[in-house]
Amino acid sequence: MRFFATFFLLAMLVVATKMGPMRIAEARHCESLSHRFKGPCTRDSNCASVCETERFSGGNCHGFRRRCFCTKPC
């Protein structure tokens, strides 16, 4: 019985370490269509740099029409 309890405790410890650290809840991000980006949005990095000039924290290309959407924490 003692062996089983030790084995069970070690198994639980291994399972707990495999789960990894708890994630902290992330802030929500608000999106807005960029007013200064021109042309089709093909690279997220170009979109993000234009959005930073519009006082946003970043930007991504979205949708079928590949438009630039700026993001910031709400």
UniProtKB/Swiss-Prot annotation:
Residues 1-19 form the signal peptide. Pfam families: Gamma-thionin. Disulfide bonds join C30-C74, C41-C61, C47-C68, C51-C70. This is Defensin-like protein P322. One of its GO terms (biological process) is defense response to fungus. Gene3D superfamilies: Knottin, scorpion toxin-like. Keywords: Antimicrobial, Disulfide bond, Fungicide, Plant defense, Secreted, Signal. One of its GO terms (cellular component) is extracellular region. It comes from Solanum tuberosum (Potato). Belongs to the DEFL family. Protease inhibitor I18 (RTI/MTI-2) subfamily. Tuber. It is found in: Secreted. PANTHER family: DEFENSIN-LIKE PROTEIN 1, DEFENSIN-LIKE PROTEIN P322.
